[in-house]
Regions:
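Active-site rim helix/loop that mediates acceptor-substrate recognition in acyltransferases
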Residues: 17-43, 52
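A short beta-loop-alpha structural element at the N-terminal edge
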Residues: 1-8
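Conserved beta-strand-loop-alpha-helix junction that forms the acyl-donor binding cleft
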Residues: 90-93, 116-129
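Conserved acetyl-CoA-binding loop-helix of GNAT-fold acetyltransferases
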Residues: 88, 94-107, 130, 134
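Conserved active-site alpha-helix within GNAT-family acetyltransferase domains
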Residues: 99, 122-142
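Conserved acyl-donor/pantetheine-binding loop and adjacent beta-alpha core of acyl/acetyltransferases
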Residues: 52-85
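C-terminal "cap" of GNAT-fold acetyltransferases
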Residues: 144-158
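Conserved GNAT acetyl-CoA-binding A-motif
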Residues: 81, 108-122
């Protein structure tokens, strides 16, 4: 992972505001270190995209979105894992990388009930809404944090 960190940070920056903005590669590393991180790479082992998964109850992960899913999980009496972010390099988009990352997550999450993800509605990220809906995610809630930031919460049965 340390060798890939610079490339993952570049992918993350190019994907903002669709994913959380980080001020530095070390800022991104902080979240990666708390997560399960899967990386898709090309034949030369250059990263094309990545997805990070956070276990509910990870208190070191300071995220109102994770806290929302923890409350939803408790209300629904279910087992869930949270997608912190999925990001694909601009030149690799439209080639199935994001779907391949999610398919890998579905495999390693066997035995879990749900996968949770949030998608921006303000600023809107219509491509991500379509992508998640196409993969079977259902909208289960929304939250407005500010006039410039609102999210939709999606879950998918695994």
């Amino acid at each position: 992972m340390p060798d890939d960190l610079g490339a993952l940070y570049t992918i993350n920056r190019a994907s903002t505001p669709g994913v959380g903005s980080e001020a530095s590669a070390e800022g991104l590393k902080r979240w990666i270190d708390l997560s399960t991180c899967l990386v898709a790479a090309d034949a030369d082992d250059h990263p094309l995209g990545f997805i990070t998964l956070i276990e509910p109850g990870t208190l070191a992960y300071e995220s109102a979105n994770l806290r929302w899913f923890e409350a939803w999980q408790k209300t629904a009496s279910c087992d869930l894992i949270y997608v912190d972010r999925i990001a694909v390099a601009a030149h690799a988009r439209g080639n199935g990388i994001g779907e391949a990352l999610y398919r890998a997550v579905f495999e390693i999450s066997a035995g879990r009930q749900f996968l949770g993800a949030e998608v921006n509605t303000v600023p809107d990220n219509p491509g991500s809404h379509r992508f998640h809906q196409r993969l079977g995610f259902k909208d289960v809630g929304r939250r407005r944090y500010a006039s410039t930031y609102e999210v939709a919460y999606y879950v998918r049965e695994i």
